[in-house]
């Protein structure tokens, strides 16, 4: 199964594509969709078109996107919601099923700790997908979203305390940290 993960943002929308075969996860692609300093409708159009292009290029079977959280700044929350809506429209228009997860679910599923830092997320994504380099935070969050969906949104502790791909390497997660 091929999964497209999306970390929505008005200026930068992260994306990550992985393949899942049983407990094995494989990296396919990741990156960002950047919007120019333009009016809001143009930015939303760029996000929609970017997602549509990714779907044509990678043919995902399913997708996962982060739910909007209420920020201190209501204007930022509204703008994020609109960017998220543009991404979801691109997915739905292409017939790709959409799953939604909170940031807490994402961090628990990938790191095993709901208050994990961006750096911890990046490191776990590198280890889970056996990457040679560290992706940027937006791409790492999007890859994490795809991993979260592959795990069914469950935490590492629900999966027996150890992600199967980490167990093969003799690693486990304790208090949000990777230990050997």
UniProtKB/Swiss-Prot annotation:
Question: Tell me, what is an example of a GO biological process annotation in this record?
Answer: DNA recombination
Residues engaged in binding Mg(2+) 2 = 66
As its record notes, the protein acts as a catalyst of:
Endonucleolytic cleavage at a junction such as a reciprocal single-stranded crossover between two homologous DNA duplexes (Holliday junction)
**Co-factor binding details:** Binds 2 Mg(2+) ion per subunit.
Q: Required co-factor?
A: Mg(2+)
Q: Which InterPro entries match?
A: RNaseH-like_sf (IPR012337), RNaseH_sf (IPR036397), X-over_junc_endoDNase_Mg_BS (IPR020563), X-over_junc_endoDNase_RuvC (IPR002176)
What is annotated as the active site?
A: 7, 66, 138
This protein's GO cellular component annotations are: cytoplasm; Holliday junction resolvase complex
Which SUPFAM superfamilies does its entry note? Answer: Ribonuclease H-like
Q: Where in the cell is it found?
A: Cytoplasm
The entry's Mg(2+) 1-binding residues are: 7, 138
Q: Which UniProt keywords apply?
A: Cytoplasm, DNA damage, DNA recombination, DNA repair, DNA-binding, Endonuclease, Hydrolase, Magnesium, Metal-binding, Nuclease
GO molecular function terms listed in the Swiss-Prot or TrEMBL record: crossover junction DNA endonuclease activity; DNA binding; magnesium ion binding
Pfam family for this entry, one: RuvC
Q: Looking at the record's lineage, which domain of life comes first?
A: Bacteria
Enzyme class of the recorded protein, top EC level: hydrolase
Primary site of residence: cytoplasm
Which EC number(s) does UniProt give? 3.1.21.10
Q: Which family does it belong to?
A: Belongs to the RuvC family.
* Task of the protein: The RuvA-RuvB-RuvC complex processes Holliday junction (HJ) DNA during genetic recombination and DNA repair. Endonuclease that resolves HJ intermediates. Cleaves cruciform DNA by making single-stranded nicks across the HJ at symmetrical positions within the homologous arms, yielding a 5'-phosphate and a 3'-hydroxyl group; requires a central core of homology in the junction. The consensus cleavage sequence is 5'-(A/T)TT(C/G)-3'. Cleavage occurs on the 3'-side of the TT dinucleotide at the point of strand exchange.
Assembly notes: Homodimer which binds Holliday junction (HJ) DNA. The HJ becomes 2-fold symmetrical on binding to RuvC with unstacked arms; it has a different conformation from HJ DNA in complex with RuvA. In the full resolvosome a probable DNA-RuvA(4)-RuvB(12)-RuvC(2) complex forms which resolves the HJ.
Q: What is this protein called?
A: Crossover junction endodeoxyribonuclease RuvC
Originating species: Paraburkholderia phytofirmans (strain DSM 17436 / LMG 22146 / PsJN) (Burkholderia phytofirmans)
